[in-house]
Amino acid sequence: NFLNHEITGCLIRLHGQSLNEHDEEVVGMMFRVVSNIERIGDHAENIAEYSQMKSSQRIKFSDEAFGQLKDISEKTLKVFKESISIYDNESFDRLDEITNLEEEIDDLKDKYIEDHIVRLKHDNCKPRGGVIFTDMVTDLERCSDHAINIAFAINGEKALGIVKKSYVIGKAE
């Protein structure tokens, strides 16, 4: 939060200067990126707190639940790394791939929560663990949402056009 406020303050001061159109776009892009990184940090902090709670209360997850958390975590991290790469390199080569992966994460969140309800019904997991599991899965999915926003922050219209074009081409084949 401290860094977010400091960086945002600098960007506001920059925005107050006489900037050309390109520089105004860059400052706007940076606002969006900083905001999304800060939100990812908030969700990561939540996940860390859930992990500490799980540990301190000696809550166990089933192997299936643990595997699902690992799976969605790895996919979320991939979306984040690729989004940062797209941002750093201003290269949209893999944008459709990570957009599809982010959509998969959305679907997995719903599936994993449904699976967890079934585990609770069959007493394979305990209610205290169920709340932590669903909160962690939800926070990971939100991290992927904010991560993909970073990739789209460069030039949302250009990026969206590339994704739509590749989606249409993929459907036509």
Identify the role of each PLM range.
Residues N1-E173:
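Cytosolic, long alpha-helical scaffolding segments
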